[in-house]
Amino acid sequence: MTNLRKTHPLIKIINHSFTVLPAPSNISAWWNFGSLLGACLIIQILTGLFLAMHYTADTLTAFSSVAHICRDVNYGWLIRNLHANGASMFFMCLFLHVGRGIYYGSYLYKETWNIGVILLLTVMATAFVGYVLPWGQMSFWGATVITNLLSAIPYIGTTLVEWIWGGFSVDKATLTRFFAFHFILPFIITALVLVHLLFLHETGSNNPSGINPDSDKIPFHPYYTIKDALGLMLMLLVLLTLALFSPDMLGDPDNFSPAKPTQHPPHIKPEWYFLFAYAILRSIPNKLGGVLALLASILILLIIPLLHTSKQRSLMFRPISQTLFWILTANLITLTWIGGQPVEQPFIIIGQIASISYFLLIILLMPLAGLFENYMLEPKW
């Protein structure tokens, strides 16, 4: 078996990726989120597959097919709750994974980081089209509002929106193609994950200190397989607690009503994991400006490696940058809260201040803090 593990063309790849992979000896629990995201992806694909067996992508029957899954299909309620709350766990792990990358300077592995940002965008697109499928009130109006943002693109905007809708409004054609997208995208994500891992294994993992760990490495198995297994059990505990005790806590009550194109819900808001970007979108009164800010709020991650000014990789020994990082975290939580509030004072001004702070912290304050810390480290005698 040992020889097969080392010689078989397929098993050899798995062996080098998960068994004998040299890993830094000091990586903390913040390095667990990669494997947790892999687990989330597998859970989402499996539960999604079983849901797709019973779902019908038709405006007349989509809502009732979801109700049928929950009422009549064996453990359908559990599969649906795991899928809906699994998305929340996915994004929770994603945000923590990206946050870890920023804190410890993992973004300096540029290829891995850029593929990661593309992955984030793809997962966001998948979650958006998936939210439309139950065809509840918030599904319908969320799809209408967000796709309508493309009409802000000069000259081709209106044509583009109608092309995506497959008509002159969000209707049967839209639902059918969104279901097709929602089915295919997770497999594209899986392929991108393999590319992400390919680039990561070219360089090896970063570590909390940010210094080269080559002098002190240990095999991935059994040390990190057991550590990842513990993280996985904790995540599954949270997911099952959520799915079994309060499955609708993170959803919107409006989505329990079938879609009514003639009746507008009082407040349109996306799922919690999009609220920070939605708050940035709403904070700009101009439509095109809002759309550009929305895009910039995610794409800004691509320029983070270019904004690295410090001589140290990690924030572990950089208290000023650490403070700014946690201010940025608090800022994102504030934006998430604002995104769920109605468009009225004082929420408008808080959202605008938080949006400006978000871009200011990343583009200006954190690079300046890096330069200042470099200056502080230089001997003055």
Swiss-Prot record:
A ubiquinone binds at residue 201. It comes from the Eukaryota. Heme b b562 binds at residues 83, 182. Its cofactor is heme b. It is a multi-pass membrane protein. Keywords: Electron transport, Heme, Iron, Membrane, Metal-binding, Mitochondrion, Mitochondrion inner membrane, Respiratory chain, Transmembrane, Transmembrane helix, Transport, Ubiquinone. Binds 2 heme b groups non-covalently. It is found in: Mitochondrion inner membrane. The keyword Nucleus does not apply. Heme 1 (or BL or b562) is low-potential and absorbs at about 562 nm, and heme 2 (or BH or b566) is high-potential and absorbs at about 566 nm. The cytochrome bc1 complex contains 11 subunits: 3 respiratory subunits (MT-CYB, CYC1 and UQCRFS1), 2 core proteins (UQCRC1 and UQCRC2) and 6 low-molecular weight proteins (UQCRH/QCR6, UQCRB/QCR7, UQCRQ/QCR8, UQCR10/QCR9, UQCR11/QCR10 and a cleavage product of UQCRFS1). This cytochrome bc1 complex then forms a dimer. This is Cytochrome b. It comes from Macropus giganteus. The gene is MT-CYB.
